[in-house]
């Protein structure tokens, strides 16, 4: 792997490399990358999806290499700017605390002030007390406020600017995918690099880059988001807000009007799409096909607000205050654009420099699963992102390495290459170092009913019985992967007491405990069982006895009614393709492989996998799932 990466870098080419768990993937790309970077005076950008991998790289793998390699190199992690405290914003907040915050928030602000004197890096992960999000959002680094001009310089005490300054002397820079695409936007015209003029990129956990880039290109807007920023400007009920630091009585009425119009607009959207008509959607999403489905109630008042906010600039008493004002102007301008684009579907009218229509966008309305009656979002997404990667990532005379344990379908890179526009990118696939035939046994119940709307109770009952049966084989120690939240919670209720009688604690995602805490508890309590949804199908690393049993409740096909899935399938069909075999099945197989990969993390690990979906043996496409993983013993349970 290291030789292949070094050869690719020397040739200034791009590479997809599938590297299974257990081969020492991070060392295999870091060693050649460091040598190449030092030799050619380049920077290595390592981008990951999970925080766990970032911390492993910066706290474990890189320090180890710094101690043993004969070449010296510096490495630094850069987090998103909102993770850093901005001392200037903090002082501005302290000076205006009476008009910005209530009593409890002022106490939290004072705690932050005292913490700022002792913290070494100023990141929120270093905070050792309960943090109020409202307070933190008022003092963290922001793009238009905490700039090099306002907070930089050789003697700066700004944590974010200091972190960026240290990057200039670093050979290896670790970021996450979201931050990479955010930073890349600002310098994408520089054809000699990505984040720096002379750099190259290694995307680890590369199976996630398409989704992250897609989310970055198409931001959403919710009723709660608009309300939040309006109340930060001025909260009439609490008599708090930024505008109280300026002569702005004439704007306060505009804000109240916008709050009312915001509620009315999103209420009308929800009512017309989800509560009336015979063809109303059954789920939480509704695709929008036509322009101007609702009147833009907020447009005039939003334009009025922006005009009035700009008129306040001469009244600002300091540069910090003007920067805060400008950030509000930027925020509301962006909201105005998203709203206008959604109602007029403007992205579908954009053409490239050859007057060719750009990729289609799909638009939809989404209800929050937590507050479906009140929080409504308007969303959009590109249907195909391959052009974006062709033009911006796989550029000539640059190098990008994309690596993951799951980039192929039945040992073939074609699907992943087509999705990312990397048809001409080099490819390499490594075999797993594990002996799956010795370490893993798969069980598949033959008679379990298929999930369907007309037999939910029967399916749920049988599924619960089989989960309980397989948990019993290993006496706990199981990760149970679901694709449906309601089903997971219902079965959790059914099994919790039964498992407790066997001294097996059941941990369930979505019960108020964070993902990281659930995993920590699961690792430490060897006999516990963890029920998880989408995020637990990947990025879970629990070597040893604690995870000896992986139970998949269903093959992980995407919900076919989701607007993005619908649009992607239509896009393929319109080109004469087969959307099931060219999109739905490959996506499910990749996720299936990710799920299977949770079980064996070390060559001493052993365990079982129970697949509680007999489509894998009854349907013609089932063989593609089993063929996508290493050969192991399979038992069909009668």
PLM region spans:
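A contiguous, basic/glycine-rich beta-loop/short-helix subdomain that forms a polymer-engagement track
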Residues: 137-171, 181-192, 311-448, 454-459, ...
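Conserved RecA-like P-loop NTPase helicase motor core
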Residues: 445-458, 510-617
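A substrate-engagement module of RecA-like helicase motors
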Residues: 41-171, 178-181, 233-249, 304-314, ...
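Conserved helicase motor "Helicase C" RecA-like lobe of SF1/SF2 P-loop NTPases
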Residues: 483-510
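Conserved pre-motif I regulatory segment
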Residues: 1-18
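N-terminal targeting/trafficking signals and adjacent low-complexity tails
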Residues: 610-638
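Conserved RecA-like ASCE P-loop NTPase motor core of nucleic-acid helicases/translocases
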Residues: 43-52, 401-405, 476-487, 610-612
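Signature of the SF2 helicase/ATPase Hel1-core->accessory helical subdomain module
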Residues: 29, 35, 55, 60-63, ...
């Amino acid at each position: 792997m290291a030789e292949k990466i070094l050869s690719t870098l020397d040739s200034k080419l791009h590479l997809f490399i599938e590297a299974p768990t257990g081969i020492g993937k991070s060392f295999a790309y870091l060693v050649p990358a460091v040598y190449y970077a030092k030799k050619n005076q380049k920077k290595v950008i390592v981008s990951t999806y999970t925080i766990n991998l970032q911390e492993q790289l910066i706290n474990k793998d890189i320090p180890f290499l710094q101690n043993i390699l004969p070449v010296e190199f510096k490495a630094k992690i850069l987090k998103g700017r909102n993770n850093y405290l901005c001392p200037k914003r903090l002082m501005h907040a302290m000076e205006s605390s009476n008009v910005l915050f209530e009593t409890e928030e002022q106490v939290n602000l004072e705690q932050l002030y005292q913490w700022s004197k002792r913290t070494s890096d100023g990141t929120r992960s270093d905070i050792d007390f309960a943090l109020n999000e409202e307070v933190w959002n008022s003092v963290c680094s922001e793009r238009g406020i905490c700039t090099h001009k306002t907070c930089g310089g050789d003697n700066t005490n700004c944590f974010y600017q200091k972190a960026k300054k240290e990057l200039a002397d670093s050979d290896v820079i670790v970021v996450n995918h979201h931050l990479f695409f955010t930073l890349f936007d600002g310098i994408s015209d520089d054809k000699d690099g990505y984040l720096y003029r002379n750099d190259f990129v290694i995307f680890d956990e590369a199976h996630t880059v398409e989704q992250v880039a897609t989310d970055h290109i198409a931001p959403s807007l919710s009723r709660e988001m608009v309300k939040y920023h309006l109340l930060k400007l001025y909260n009439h009920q609490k008599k708090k807000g930024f505008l109280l630091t300026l002569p702005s009585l004439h704007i306060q009425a505009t804000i109240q009007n916008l709050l009312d119009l915001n509620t009315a607009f999103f209420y009308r959207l929800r009512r017309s799409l989800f509560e009336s008509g015979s063809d109303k959607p059954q789920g939480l999403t509704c695709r929008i096909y036509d322009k101007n489905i609702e009147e833009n109630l907020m447009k005039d008042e939003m334009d009025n607000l922006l005009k009035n906010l700009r008129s306040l600039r001469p009244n600002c008493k300091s540069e910090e205050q003007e920067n805060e004002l400008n950030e509000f102007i930027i925020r509301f301008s962006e909201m105005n654009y998203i709203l206008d684009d959604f109602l007029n579907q403007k992205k579908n009218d954009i053409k490239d420099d050859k007057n060719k229509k750009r990729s289609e966008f799909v638009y939809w309305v989404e209800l929050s699963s937590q507050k479906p009656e009140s929080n409504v979002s308007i969303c959009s997404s590109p249907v195909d992102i391959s052009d974006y990667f062709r033009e911006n990532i796989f550029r000539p005379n640059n190098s990008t390495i994309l690596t993951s344990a799951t980039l192929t379908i039945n040992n073939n890179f074609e699907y992943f290459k087509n999705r990312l526009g990397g048809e001409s990118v080099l490819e390499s696939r490594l075999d797993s170092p594990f002996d799956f035939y010795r370490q893993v046994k798969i069980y598949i119940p033959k008679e379990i009913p298929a999930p369907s709307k007309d037999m939910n109770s029967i399916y749920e009952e049988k599924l619960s019985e089989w989960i309980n049966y397989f948990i019993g084989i290993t006496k706990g120690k199981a990760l149970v992967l679901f694709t449906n939240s309601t089903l997971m919670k219902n079965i959790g209720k059914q099994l919790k007491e039964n498992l407790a009688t066997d001294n097996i604690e059941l941990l369930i995602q979505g019960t108020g405990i964070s993902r990281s805490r659930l995993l920590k508890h699961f690792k430490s309590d060897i006999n516990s069982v963890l029920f998880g949804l989408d995020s637990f199908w990947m990025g879970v690393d629990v070597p040893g006895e604690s995870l000896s049993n992986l139970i998949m409740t269903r093959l992980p096909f995407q919900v076919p009614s989701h607007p993005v899935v619908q649009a992607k399938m239509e896009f393929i069909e319109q080109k004469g393709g087969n959307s099931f075999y060219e999109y739905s099945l490959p996506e499910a197989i990749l996720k299936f492989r990710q799920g299977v990969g949770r079980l064996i993390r070390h060559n001493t690990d052993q365990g079982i996998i129970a697949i509680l979906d007999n489509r894998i043996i009854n349907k013609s496409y089932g063989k593609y799932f089993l063929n996508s993983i290493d050969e192991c013993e399979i038992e069909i349970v009668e």
